[in-house]
Amino acid sequence: MARKYIDILKKSKMMLFQDVGKSFEDDSPCKEEAPKTQIQHSVRDFCEQTTFHGVNMIFTTSLYWVRFLWVVVSLVCICLCMYSFSHVKDKYDRKEKIVNVELVFESAPFPAITVCNLNPFKNHLARSVPEISETLDAFHQAVVYSNDATMDELSGRGRRSLNDGPSFKYLQYEPVYSDCSCVPGRQECIAQTSAPRTLENACICNYDRHDGSAWPCYSAQTWEKSICPECNDIGFCNVPNTTGSGNIPCYCQLEMGYCVFQPESRVRRIWEFQGNKIPEKGSPLRKEYMEQLTQLGYGNMTDQVAITTQAKEKMILKMSGLHPQRRAALGYGKSELIKMCSFNGQQCNIDTEFKLHIDPSFGNCYTFNANPEKKLASSRAGPSYGLRLMMFVNSSDYLPTTEATGVRIAIHGKEECPFPDTFGYSAPTGVISSFGISLRNINRLPQPYGNCLQKDNPQSRSIYKGYKYEPEGCFRSCYQYRIIAKCGCADPRYPKPWKRSAWCDSTNTTTLNCLTTEGAKLSTKENQKHCKCIQPCQQDQYTTTYSAAKWPSGSIQTSCDNHSKDCNSYLREHAAMIEIYYEQMSYEILRESESYSWFNLMADMGGQAGLFLGASIMSVIEFLFFAVRTLGIACKPRRWRQKTELLRAEELNDAEKGVSTNNN
């Protein structure tokens, strides 16, 4: 009995352990399903609970035909949503922008004002420069011919190389051919500007380049070519067989013991550069006249506007080749040009408030308010509170190439380089010219919304050092670099990028041809693309309105120094009155902004997702949690599984020990 009782007790103990172990396996947190089963359960739970309404309806319905219907509807909505997404993305990729206009009611800072005389150099001083004198003489010859040219001659004229032209040594005196009126019984003759029938009937005169006089004159037959022992700096030579050790070609009138330096090319004809008529048709001098005109660069030109334009370009090039101090001495001084000045109702200090700016086209210009550190502003709108100037241009000393009398004005920012030839306004004499200005501050967007240069990214290749970036300065810099690369020298009209660069010789015809050719190439749209000159991101733009009235009036009391008898008429001919002022005490700020930002993109995409899928940002977060959970199940390490099994075994052992203890 006892033995039987012990067997029954052992059997009960074993059954109790199995029941406890089974209960532990059912309730233990360490029990783990297969990863595949866990993923299936995770997907099922997500689909049944998700806020993506189409997915939810597919997995919660029990009818197959309803489930199929929801699948079709969901696919159609997904396609429509993706199509809508593509349109929204295209709109964002276009990087469209809008311009916001803000009107600021306060006094705007006054701009810098650069004023110039339309005539760049004084005529009497410019003619003392041999290069300019030659250019003006050639211009005179071209204008005279244009008044008397015939189409038959023009069609038969071909352009010759400028290398065949004259090459003079620049001295004050030179021999010239002239038609003469000789007094019987005297050797000397009187020079005339008309053309003789032949050179044999002409005289040779000693021509003074400085004052344009031709004296003395002797018959050409009494002059002979010779070799002189010495010539001085102004062109006179010692007669042969006298003091000196040189062998210099010269022209001599031996009867008078008179010799002058012989030019390297042909002797000039006075009727070509001072005469008012060309040689008669059929004369041998007429053909020579036209050949000379072609060599000077005016071949096949009869339009005086075109002739004047070309003469201006030649003169600008030759003047630009002079030393800046010498060039400035040929122009107008500050006190000569600006006679009276007031700003904001107060008298200006002309000596200190105007800064010299030498422009290649207009010579000496003067800039008011050029100091960036000094801020000037008008206290009120209107002419009385702006800049008022009386300028004296002295039109009696104008160059023959200057077509109008008056002044040139450029309105620009204080940190910008003035370009009066490109962005200037002309004001005539005898008129009070009023320029009403308005400021517009422009703020552009950089990449990817626009293409502009930011302020903190200056152009290192700009030749205008110390000035703010401008597209015009960029184009001129690009042109200068191209000229240096192609012609081997720098255009004298613009600054040099490097000190080691040499200026182009304006008297060298090969160099001039290179400047003309390369300048024409750069003017094409295709070549301008290589310059990559873009607008600045921040820019002050001044708009101008112009009005004028006759000046001075008959009742005004004016002083004209030595011309007090008819002062008003004198001022109308030689002076101009200028007014530059703000039209209103406000200015505009134009600011570009994003038309369609990243926030707009997200909002529109969310709206489309909600419309077609019933989804929101919460749905996206929900899906991300599901994806992370599923990925974690699929990528669970094997070591973690082994550790879980070990923990489960330990728990079973602990449970067995617990049962044993309870039985005891």
UniProtKB/Swiss-Prot annotation:
It is found in: Membrane. GO terms for biological process: sodium ion transmembrane transport. It is a multi-pass membrane protein. The keyword Membrane applies. The keyword Acyltransferase does not apply. One of its GO terms (molecular function) is ligand-gated sodium channel activity. This is Degenerin del-1.
